[in-house]
UniProtKB/Swiss-Prot annotation:
Segments crossing the lipid bilayer: 16-36, 52-72, 78-98, 101-121, 125-145, 164-184, 186-206, 237-257
Keywords: Cell inner membrane, Cell membrane, Lipid biosynthesis, Lipid metabolism, Membrane, Nucleotidyltransferase, Phospholipid biosynthesis, Phospholipid metabolism, Transferase, Transmembrane, Transmembrane helix
Organism field: Helicobacter pylori (strain ATCC 700392 / 26695) (Campylobacter pylori)
EC number(s) stated in the UniProt entry for this protein: 2.7.7.41
Protein name, per record: Phosphatidate cytidylyltransferase
Entry annotated with the keyword Transmembrane: yes
Pathway in which this enzyme or protein is active: Phospholipid metabolism; CDP-diacylglycerol biosynthesis; CDP-diacylglycerol from sn-glycerol 3-phosphate: step 3/3
Gene name linked to the record: cdsA
GO cellular component: plasma membrane
Membrane-topology annotation of the record: Multi-pass membrane protein
One Pfam family here: CTP_transf_1
InterPro entries in the record: PC_trans
EC supergroup of this enzyme: transferase
Localization in the cell: Cell inner membrane
Length: 266
């Protein structure tokens, strides 16, 4: 009983600290600061992914990680750096016998998600990150309490504790709350923000499911222990990483559509 109470207390304290830190970083609204902090988080998440994919850590893995993250700061399209890092790792695997083919996987997950998250901030600003946070948190909270109150139907065999009813409630709540945050110039209006929030929430659900699948596959409860009461970095950011990729893609194509419409109008 004492152990459970301590865990819950640690969970709330850690959650409060994370909210404060996130608020300060977004309030500062500084590209270099965001890049540096997110890079450190990426390094921790990458280490956790090595464990999930059962890949042995090596100098070449972390060298590629560091160089690709530095390149992302100067590159106009950070996600390209994630894909290049995966290609470089594939080349290393092909050249050396020291690495198994699984060594490429951490560059895809969580790699692509972290680069997408940085891309969202770099291309669309702090308001886009806040929008993403609201959608993901609302989806998680809605799914948790909705599942507790109304959940009956298991959502998937890979995560039997999650229910279909909870997931649907989470997506609906995230869509509604997210639409009010994203309804400004970023999306072009309420209905577009509602549609985007719905898609992001939907994608975020599968980020959570994928992380659960990986943990069950290797027989562990948490991806790490760095966050007391919460587990690892990937335990907290799994939905966020999938959602970031979805949001960046949606906003990117929306910009292209707007530019095309202006061009055709001229």
């Amino acid at each position: 009983m004492k152990e459970e109470l301590f865990k819950e207390k640690s969970r709330y304290i850690t959650g409060f600290v994370l909210i404060i830190v996130a608020d300060l970083i977004l309030y500062a609204d500084n590209l270099l600061l965001f890049w540096a902090v997110l890079g450190g988080i990426y390094a921790v998440g990458f280490s956790e992914a090595l464990r999930l994919f059962q890949v042995k850590a090596s100098f070449s893995l972390y060298l590629i990680l560091v160089l690709s993250w530095v390149a992302a700061y100067f590159n106009g399209r950070p996600i390209e750096c994630a894909l290049i890092s995966a290609m470089v790792m594939a080349s290393v695997i092909a050249y050396q016998k020291a690495h198994h083919s699984e060594a490429i996987l951490p560059f895809l997950y969580p790699g692509v998600g972290f680069f997408a998250l940085f891309g969202v901030y770099k291309d669309f600003g702090a308001v886009a990150i806040i929008w993403l946070l609201v959608v993901v948190v609302a989806s998680d909270v809605g799914a948790f309490f909705g599942g507790k109150l109304l959940g009956k139907t298991p959502f998937t065999p890979t995560s039997p504790n999650k229910t279909l009813e909870g997931a649907l409630i989470g997506v609906v709540l995230a869509s509604v709350l997210g639409s009010f945050v994203g309804m400004g110039k970023l999306s072009g209006g309420f209905f577009m923000a509602l549609f985007f929030s719905f898609l992001i929430a939907l994608v975020a659900v599968f980020g959570d499911l994928y992380e659960s699948y990986l943990k069950r596959k290797v027989g562990i409860k948490d991806s790490g222990k760095i966050l007391p009461g919460h587990g690892g970095v990937l335990d907290r950011l799994d939905s966020m990483l999938f959602g970031a990729l979805g949001l960046h893609a949606l906003l990117y194509f929306l910009e292209i559509w707007k530019e095309t419409a202006v061009f055709l109008g001229d």
